[in-house]
Amino acid sequence: MSYSLRIADLPEDERPREKLLKYGAKHLGNAELIAILLATGQGKGKLSAVGLGQYILQQLGQNRQDPMDVLRNIHPQELIAFPGIGPAKATTILAAVELGKRVFQSRPLEKMVVDSPEAAAIALSQDLMWQTQEHFAIVMLDVKNRLLATKVITIGTATETLIHPREIFREVIKQGATRLIVAHNHPSGGLEPSPEDIRLTEFLLQGAQYLQIPVLDHLILGHGKHQSLRQCTDLWERFPQGD
């Protein structure tokens, strides 16, 4: 596809809007999705809307960055700096990005059963998934793993958060929960548990054994992904929770 060719001059099955209607949004590339938001390119003889979308992604992807990660938190003036992008197009893109975040984060909480890392990640996505600071939160459950409440316990720096097990179990007992899942985010998007993450989990599992309030998992969240320490470590074999 020529990125200077007007979308109106493309074969119908190559036009972003027509492709979306015929095949669904998931079949469009990122540049094509941006093109739909832009509606127009830079003008006659210059980049089409698809070409401009591709150019934006290329520029955002400099220095080996993921352009979608950059776009997730981009400032309006950064978009307006691109030739062919004015306030109207910039705000349309930013509104779409924000709407996507909210759709991802939205979930029905009442009577939600949290019986997997995926379900726990959904329950905590609004509090943890896209934060630029490190947050530590807990999911409190009843005996049937039904969600009672979620709570952010601490907000730390971008690299660490300070938490003591007693703060966690105090809140769990206060809510009348019988089991819990703990979680924190890595603002970098990396999901590898740090030595501090492992040590804190050990302390929590030991405290849970003493209080007979099982800790079902410790999740790390970031940039739309999650990691379960129960699945990637042997901590629950070393400190059984009786769950």
Swiss-Prot record:
Protein known as: UPF0758 protein sll0766
Family matches, as InterPro entries: MPN (IPR037518), RadC_JAB (IPR025657), UPF0758 (IPR001405), UPF0758_CS (IPR020891), UPF0758_N (IPR046778)
Position of sequence motif JAMM motif: 184-197
Residues forming coiled coils: none
Superkingdom to which the source organism belongs: Bacteria
Residue positions binding Zn(2+): H184, H186, D197
Domain MPN: 113-235
Key words of the record: Hydrolase, Metal-binding, Metalloprotease, Protease, Zinc
One Pfam family per UniProt: UPF0758_N
Source organism of this protein record: Synechocystis sp. (strain ATCC 27184 / PCC 6803 / Kazusa)
GO molecular function: metal ion binding; metallopeptidase activity
BP GO annotations: proteolysis
Hydrolase is among the record's keywords: yes
Disulfide pattern: none
NCBIfam families named in the record: PRK00024.1 (NF000642), radc (TIGR00608)
